[in-house]
């Protein structure tokens, strides 16, 4: 992938030009983590960067995703914190581009922020909710809220298309569901190395679950680990997942999914690019952590029930970013992309198919027996 803009443009080029939208991407610099990541009793030497990507259509937020990137000495973790839609995206009768765009964004992050000889992991917990990022968007009748099973399938398709410099191992775990049923949700590949594994990536060399499972904000694994700490319990990694099936997030007849993509370390370091290079490559803008936090918290207090309210909330958020001292007046960080498939492309494809379907005479003339004349 050359850069984020090129990648997103390519991901939707098979869609018609009517599919037009803009996107924005903001992120913060890495700062030392202020809470325990592995060991509850001490602050680990881990660094965190926040990344927020959003899609606009008709000047209103349509979709957004937040990814938290953690750097430890042994692992880079890309934790998908939250993702949500408003229901204000006009597909014009075409397939939705959202899965392809989000896969492209995650692929960009993996390539851009990979570190030399250090493995990377994408981590995600999915649970169906009416809204995550956009308050009151659940009141919009146009918003299609995926149920628990639909959401698991949606994320499996998104993550299945994520590409790093090397192919990842892909893990999915649905607490309380047996492996055979779980794998029915996953995309299947002719190359079995590309198929999903029912399980988790955490390998224990005698350590307890609390020593090898990182802690993330607003994450059910973290809540369970904290509960175990308060109760003074130490459990193995296998016991941890066995008990997780009985946690509040995983019961009441609804399924939840835990996903992990494991990318091996490589000999290239993607973190050497400077901020200036990122701006030239149209790869988003870095802003101050305080501004990021202010914008994010304002988002969670906004109203996205109607299109007009969504436009107003979107404009306020973008103005807050533009008015910060981190943004130069000349920087155009909101990028517009469109599908490129035309009616001529469709016609040409139809002609190609009809040509393939034409019968072809493959008989040799010498093999055709001529009918003898009657005497």
Swiss-Prot record:
Active site (UniProt)? 219 (proton donor/acceptor)
GO cellular component terms, semicolon-separated: nucleus
- Which residues are recorded as modified (N6-acetyllysine)? 221
Q: What does this protein do?
A: Histone chaperone-dependent acetylase that modifies 'Lys-56' of histone H3 (H3K56ac). Histone H3 'Lys-56' acetylation may be required for S-phase-linked DNA damage tolerance. Also acetylates 'Lys-9' of histone H3 (H3K9ac). Autoacetylates.
Q: Name one Pfam family in it.
A: HAT_KAT11
User: What class does this enzyme belong to in the EC scheme?
Assistant: transferase
Query: What family is reported?
Result: Belongs to the RTT109 family.
Spell out the subcellular localization from the entry. Answer: Nucleus
Q: Which gene encodes it?
A: Rtt109
Q: Which residues does the annotation say bind acetyl-CoA? A: 125, 144-146, 154
Q: Name one GO biological process term.
A: DNA damage response
List, in alphabetical order, the Gene Ontology terms for molecular function in this entry: histone H3K56 acetyltransferase activity
Keywords (A to Z) from UniProt: Acetylation, DNA damage, Nucleus, Transcription, Transcription regulation, Transferase
Q: Species name for this entry?
A: Pneumocystis carinii
* Protein name stated in the entry: Histone acetyltransferase Rtt109
Q: How does it assemble?
A: Forms a complex composed of two RTT109 subunits and one VPS75 homodimer. Interacts with ASF1.
